[in-house]
Amino acid sequence: MEYKRPIGLDIDLETGVIPGAKKLVRRLSDLKGYFLDEEAYNELLKEDPVVYEVYAIEQEEKEGDLNFATTVLYPGKVGKEFFFTKGHFHAKPDRAEIYYGIKGKGGMLLQTPEGEAEWIPMGPGTVVYVPPYWAHRTVNTGNEPFIFLAIYPADAGHDYGSIKEKGFSKIVIEEDGEVKVVDNPRWKE
């Protein structure tokens, strides 16, 4: 039997970069229709800022293996809503995931298919377990990049379509200088 070789990589804890990783950049234009305040979205779209970057080390898409990635989620808001990742269910919904906060301040918004939502604040050292069947999105509630590590089954896949179509049942906003998790008026059951 030929065995896969182990690897060891250093993550730059200041920048979130994993040397040699596959890099994905998501700009505001990639998040059209995700934010509530369309007027604020269109105004900020003139600059089309980078909202987040992902540095992924991916394995062959097969059961039993693991992928890992860092995400650098930049600070910012569209209207009152903090910058966030697209969010997804797993294509194989019975797959779980682990997130680990490295730098900055934010949180994870999780949701069942029926819309039951949980908000878990995150900072350096916070570990979040995402159970099977829960959609998840990270949100930067701070003033610096929010950097975290994700570890997930190589065969989990991503279902972005369900979130694009229905959204999350809650949104994370700043109101009166505080982080608030409120009902999303556009959420569809």
Swiss-Prot record:
Reactions it catalyzes: alpha-D-glucose 6-phosphate = beta-D-fructose 6-phosphate
Keyword set, alphabetical order: Cytoplasm, Gluconeogenesis, Glycolysis, Iron, Isomerase, Metal-binding
Keyword hit for Glycoprotein: no
One Gene Ontology cellular component annotation held by this UniProt entry: cytoplasm
Transmembrane segments: none
Pathway the protein takes part in: Carbohydrate degradation; glycolysis; D-glyceraldehyde 3-phosphate and glycerone phosphate from D-glucose: step 2/4
Enzyme Commission number(s) of this protein: 5.3.1.9
BP GO terms, sorted: gluconeogenesis; glycolytic process
Major subcellular location class: cytoplasm
Binding positions for Fe cation per the UniProt entry: 88, 90, 97, 136
Pfam families in the cross-refs: GPI
The organism of origin for this protein: Thermococcus kodakarensis (strain ATCC BAA-918 / JCM 12380 / KOD1) (Pyrococcus kodakaraensis (strain KOD1))
Protein's cellular compartments: Cytoplasm
Gene, per the UniProt record: pgiA
Protein name from the UniProt record: Glucose-6-phosphate isomerase
InterPro entries: G6P_isomerase_archaea/bacteria (IPR016758), G6P_isomerase_prok (IPR010551), GPI/OXD (IPR051610), RmlC-like_jellyroll (IPR014710), RmlC_Cupin_sf (IPR011051)
PANTHER family: CUPIN TYPE-2 DOMAIN-CONTAINING PROTEIN, OXALATE-BINDING PROTEIN
A GO molecular-function annotation: iron ion binding
Family label: Belongs to the archaeal-type GPI family.
UniProt subunit comment: Homodimer.
Gene3D superfamilies (UniProt xref): Jelly Rolls
Keyword check for Cytoplasm: yes
